[in-house]
Amino acid sequence: MPKIKMIILALVFATILPVSAQEFSDVPALHTFAVGYAGAESKVYQSFRAVLDKGEAARPIFRRCLKTGSPAAKLYSAIGLYKLDPQEGTKALKSLASSQEQVPVMQGCIVSTYTVGEVATDLLSPNPQLLSFQAF
């Protein structure tokens, strides 16, 4: 039964997704750049890229979402800040390290659930096991 639940979650995340940067703060899951059997960019990931592509103008959006966004938006924001400025991103990830909020993570066609703290701590480690910055 848990496998069916994961498949259903993956399908939901692939169809009901934000399409604009304004909706970024409510993203339902953390997606890597390639998801699903086709390895395509999801709308969730595209909303992250839409913000990140703003360059320096993305910082205030990421900073706001780091505090008030969904669990996935908080992680995307820390990752985005890291891509813009590794020092600020590291500080953001450290601020999330103790979070017990649950976040679905989609890599390829696999959906797993972790705490925000687990993902943040893993990204900070020298040898990440769950995700790496290259996935974003």
Predicted regions and their residues:
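Sec/Tat signal peptide C-region and signal peptidase I cleavage site
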Residues: L17-A21
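Positively charged n-region of N-terminal signal peptides that target proteins for export
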Residues: M1-I7
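Residue-level detector of extended alpha-helical repeat arrays and alpha-solenoid scaffolds
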Residues: E41-V44, K74
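Short coil turns that connect the paired helices of HEAT/ARM alpha-solenoid repeats
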Residues: L30, Y37-A38, L66-A72, S95-V111
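Short N-proximal segments of mature Sec-exported proteins
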Residues: K67-D85
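Bacterial N-terminal signal peptides
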Residues: I7-I16
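Amphipathic alpha-helical scaffolding segments comprising HEAT/armadillo-like alpha-solenoid repeats
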Residues: E23-L30, K54-C65, P86-S98, F133
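Core register positions within helices of long alpha-helical scaffolds
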Residues: S47-A50, G80-K83, S112-P126
